[in-house]
């Protein structure tokens, strides 16, 4: 009988380029416990490559096999480990000291982990240099694979944003100043809490802080850890299962700056909250700085431990509002400059006037406009801008709650009765969460008032909104479906323009 990991590998083997599968998926060992899929790579080089480039493909394949999206953890095998767990591997693989990848059915023998480690690095090096030779003989390695410990966090991160590319306006100037202040240690508080709706610049500022600190020119540059609350929880689960909690604690409590995004994800997860609270306390006691972000103001995080909320509120609180017309216009000009195009003034004004929801939509609209002009080899014009705008929610949509419910039911093909039911059927849950998300975005209803309409608790609404935001941020079939459906509802469901 093919193991769960074997089934997942079969799907990946069909969907991925053969070279990608052979080099990066075959060497992985696997263990499935509850809703966690733990993958072990021969070394950190392979583990990091898989995390950065193939994690979404693995999650998608695992979801197909398991029926629900698991938490996927990719770790490197400890240095000098003679074998991997007997429970790990592909169907037919030996329970001895081997990494899966050899198929017992074809008569080949499993290859020891350290040998695969050497082979993988050799194949990757040849691929990068343009040499297409196939891996034939696995040479005896001259040294063991990299240890589990990652290098200094600063060097392991890839910062996409900087303070220089952040467009400052009345809506975000306080958050911008506070973020720069915590880098320069001119902010009187050692904790900064950033909050805003999705797509308004939290991630940009968080990464700008990390980048500014890591680019310090002296050798005393601070140690920085940057991750989301979901990643923190995933790594904690992996540490608990591997009985390496002390190692986990040492890693996150021994940094100079912790950047933790999307802390609203922690709601309802008591074990995770306890660890975050202990980590924040430890960091503050050693004089470290902590920067947190959330899609909700700290006061709205009512399903968190009161001590944790108190810690969040004890620092400097900075909220980012939606950008005004002039700020949106300057954002368009800055992004056009990065695209190396000259945007006509009338087109700039049109886009700035019509897209008011968030910065991410502004950037996406401009990107599609520039791409369309390049593909058609035409100049950007008002006519082309209007065509591209048809795919976006123009101006801030004004809908009432009943209208949102009606449009969501139409969009997801379900009835209001099914929407209000207690069923945990996937399409009903996604539709309900979509109503929560749109109601918070387009009405003045509080989270409690939204929950009351469905006879649900405040925490259920908060969790639903977080779930939708997480799906929309992922490049998965479900994420794309949710994004497209909600965009269509917003475009067709507007009543008036403000």
From Swiss-Prot:
Gene3D superfamilies: 1.10.1750.10, 1.10.8.60, 3.30.300.180, P-loop containing nucleotide triphosphate hydrolases. PANTHER family: CHROMOSOMAL REPLICATION INITIATOR PROTEIN DNAA (PTHR30050), DNAA REGULATORY INACTIVATOR HDA (PTHR30050:SF5). NCBIfam families: DnaA (TIGR00362). It is found in: Cytoplasm. Residues 69-155 are annotated as: Domain II. This is Chromosomal replication initiator protein DnaA. Residues 1-69 are annotated as: Domain I, interacts with DnaA modulators. Domain I is involved in oligomerization and binding regulators, domain II is flexibile and of varying length in different bacteria, domain III forms the AAA+ region, while domain IV binds dsDNA. It comes from Nitratidesulfovibrio vulgaris (strain DSM 19637 / Miyazaki F). SMART domains: AAA (SM00382), Bac_DnaA_C (SM00760). Disulfide bonds: none annotated. Plays an essential role in the initiation and regulation of chromosomal replication. ATP-DnaA binds to the origin of replication (oriC) to initiate formation of the DNA replication initiation complex once per cell cycle. Binds the DnaA box (a 9 base pair repeat at the origin) and separates the double-stranded (ds)DNA. Forms a right-handed helical filament on oriC DNA; dsDNA binds to the exterior of the filament while single-stranded (ss)DNA is stabiized in the filament's interior. Keywords: ATP-binding, Cytoplasm, DNA replication, DNA-binding, Lipid-binding, Nucleotide-binding. Residues 374-498 are annotated as: Domain IV, binds dsDNA. CDD domains: AAA (cd00009), Bac_DnaA_C (cd06571). The gene is dnaA.
């Amino acid at each position: 009988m093919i193991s769960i990991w074997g089934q997942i590998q079969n799907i990946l083997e069909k969907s991925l380029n053969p070279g990608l599968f052979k080099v990066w998926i075959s060497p992985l060992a696997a263990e499935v416990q509850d809703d966690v899929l733990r993958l072990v790579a021969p070394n950190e080089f392979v583990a990091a490559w898989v995390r950065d480039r193939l994690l979404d493909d693995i999650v998608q394949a695992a979801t197909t096999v398991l029926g629900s999206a698991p938490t996927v953890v990719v770790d490197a095998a400890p240095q000098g480990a003679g074998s991997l767990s007997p429970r790990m591997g592909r169907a037919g693989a030996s329970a001895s000291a081997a990494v899966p990848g050899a198929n017992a059915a074809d008569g080949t023998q499993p290859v020891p982990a350290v040998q695969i480690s050497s082979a993988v690095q050799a194949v990757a090096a040849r691929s990068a240099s343009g040499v297409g030779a196939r891996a034939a003989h696995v040479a005896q390695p001259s040294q063991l694979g990299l240890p589990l410990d990652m290098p200094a966090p600063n060097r392991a991160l890839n910062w996409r944003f900087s303070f220089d590319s952040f467009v400052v306006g009345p809506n975000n100037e306080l958050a911008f100043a506070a973020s720069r202040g915590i880098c320069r240690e001119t902010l009187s508080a050692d904790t900064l809490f950033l909050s805003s709706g999705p797509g308004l610049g939290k991630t940009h500022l968080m990464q700008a802080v990390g980048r500014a600190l890591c680019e310090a020119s002296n050798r005393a540059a601070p140690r920085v850890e940057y991750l989301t609350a979901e990643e923190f929880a995933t790594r904690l689960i992996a540490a608990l299962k591997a009985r390496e909690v002390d190692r986990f604690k040492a890693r996150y409590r021994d940094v100079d700056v912790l950047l933790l995004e999307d802390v609203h994800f922690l709601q309802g997860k008591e074990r995770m909250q306890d660890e975050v609270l202990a980590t924040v306390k430890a960091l503050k006691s050693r004089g470290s700085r902590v920067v947190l972000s959330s899609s909700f103001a700290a006061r709205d995080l009512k399903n968190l431990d009161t001590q944790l909320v108190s810690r969040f509120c004890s620092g400097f609180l900075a909220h980012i509002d939606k950008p005004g017309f002039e700020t949106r216009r300057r954002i368009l000009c800055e992004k056009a400059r990065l695209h190396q195009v000259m945007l006509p003034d009338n087109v700039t004004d049109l886009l700035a006037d019509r897209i008011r929801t968030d910065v991410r939509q502004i950037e996406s609209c401009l990107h599609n406009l520039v791409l369309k002009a390049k593909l058609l080899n035409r100049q950007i014009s008002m006519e082309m801008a209007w065509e591209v705008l048809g795919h976006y929610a123009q101006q801030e949509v004004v809908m009432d709650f009943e209208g949102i419910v009606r449009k969501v039911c139409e969009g997801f093909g379900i009835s209001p009765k099914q929407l209000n039911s207690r069923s945990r059927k996937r399409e009903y849950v996604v539709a309900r969460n979509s109503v929560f998300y749109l109601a918070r975005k387009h009405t003045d209803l509080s989270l409690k008032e939204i929950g009351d309409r469905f006879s649900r608790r405040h925490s259920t609404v908060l969790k639903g909104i977080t779930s939708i935001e997480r799906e929309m941020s992922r490049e998965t079939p479900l994420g794309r479906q949710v994004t497209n459906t909600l965009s269509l509802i917003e475009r067709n469901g507007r009543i008036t323009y403000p």
